[in-house]
Design a protein with these regions (language model features):
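Beta->alpha turn/N-cap motifs
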Residues: 97-102, 126, 161, 191, ...
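N-terminal (or domain-start) structured segment
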Residues: 27-117, 156, 181-204, 297, ...
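N-terminal export signals
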Residues: 4, 10-27
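Hinge/capping helix and adjacent helix->loop/strand transition within the periplasmic-binding protein
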Residues: 87-92, 108-193, 242, 254-287
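Short coil/turn segments
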Residues: 46, 100, 135-140, 161-166, ...
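C-terminal lobe and pocket-closing loops
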Residues: 127, 213-281, 309-312
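Immediate post-signal peptide segment of exported/extracytoplasmic ligand-binding proteins
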Residues: 26-38, 89-93, 147-157, 218-221, ...
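An extracytoplasmic/periplasmic, membrane-proximal ligand-sensing/linker region
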Residues: 34-36, 178, 218, 265-326
């Protein structure tokens, strides 16, 4: 009898506590942030993710009235800093500003966390399409001609990437499968050396980060025939998308802002709303266009769906191509 009464009292206490828990979560969202927020960028200073973070978070600080302090925590292709955030308290005061390898690393490295379980995608601040570039001495003048040449000479076109398992390598593997071609993959140690050798004529073709290669295209040092994004892009409005020819093809380098998985929904939604406003700021939008970055308004659900689809897509490509790090 005592056990029965104890059980009833526990159940009644839990029931009575539920509204107060709900009110507590709401309160967490309403007064957040009331102190500085730490933003972990798991990449070196001056890189793409760091550049984007330093465009966005000062504006976010102005909007929300608290500092957003960027800490660079590079290592293991972003995994060290990401794991640190995944283990952090889910209170909205530690965020992660990460990049494309977040969706690639689980299939190539030993990582100590699951981004789809231990982290919550909040917002996609940018996507950067890649440009299919080549040395101007190469014969093709269009995407169709590149594909036709590759089909006529299977395995003979030298195609650079910024390294095994890089976003550029995966974009290439996705492209060759969609086009039904084979090429000779030439991995470099970074995109800079790869683009340098395309300019010098040492290697023929490359999927290059658009904000890096666009000045070379504009200066006539490389030829671009297509981009890996969707539709027309403001920074290069006359360049067609590969997806216009190969239906469904799409590949980006991107950044994603995330929080520990159990961060209150009210905080996540407040952050998403504020970030959507920040990227529409005229100064930020102009800088995005200058850097050939694409930003589209996105909800928490859309950011989450994107991260999941990227993880599934690149995992499939890595398995099919049997990609391994040397």
């Amino acid at each position: 009898m005592n056990h029965f009464n104890s059980g009833r009292r526990a159940a009644l206490s839990a029931l009575l506590a539920t509204p107060f828990l709900s009110l507590k979560v709401q309160a967490q969202g309403s007064d957040w942030p009331n102190r500085p927020v730490r933003v972990v960028v798991p990449w070196p200073p001056g890189g793409g993710a760091d550049t984007t973070a330093r465009m966005i978070f000062p504006k976010l600080a102005q909007k929300l009235g608290q500092p957003f302090v960027i800490e660079n925590r590079p290592g293991a292709s972003g995994s060290i800093g990401a794991a640190e955030v995944a283990r952090s308290a889910p209170d909205g005061y530690t965020l992660l500003h990460d990049a494309t390898p977040l969706a690639i690393n689980p299939f190539l490295l030993r990582v100590s966390f699951d981004a789809l379980v231990d982290l919550k995608a909040v917002f996609l601040p940018m996507q950067v399409p890649m440009l299919l570039v080549m040395n101007p001495a190469q014969a093709p003048k269009s995407l169709a001609e590149v594909i036709a040449l590759a089909k006529a000479r299977p395995g003979s076109l030298d195609w650079a990437s910024s390294g095994n398992g890089s976003a550029q390598h995966l974009a290439l593997e996705l492209f060759t499968r969609a086009a039904g071609i084979t090429v000779n993959h030439v991995p470099y140690r970074g995109g800079g050396p790869a683009l340098t050798d395309v300019v010098a004529g040492q290697v023929g073709y490359f999927f290059s980060n658009s904000n890096v290669s666009l000045p070379f295209v504009q200066g006539g040092r490389v030829r671009a025939v297509a981009h890996t994004g969707r539709g027309r892009i403001a920074a290069f409005p006359d360049l067609p998308a590969i997806g216009d020819t190969l239906q469904g093809y799409e590949a980006y380098e991107w950044n994603c802002i995330l929080a520990p998985a159990r961060t209150p929904t009210a905080i996540i939604e407040k952050l998403n709303t504020a970030l959507n406003e920040v990227v529409q700021d005229p100064e930020v939008a102009a800088r995005y266009t200058q850097l050939a970055m694409v930003v589209r308004p996105n909800s928490v659900a859309e950011a989450d769906s994107f991260l999941r689809s990227e993880t599934e897509k690149w995992g499939r490509v890595i398995r099919e191509a049997n990609i391994k790090l040397e």
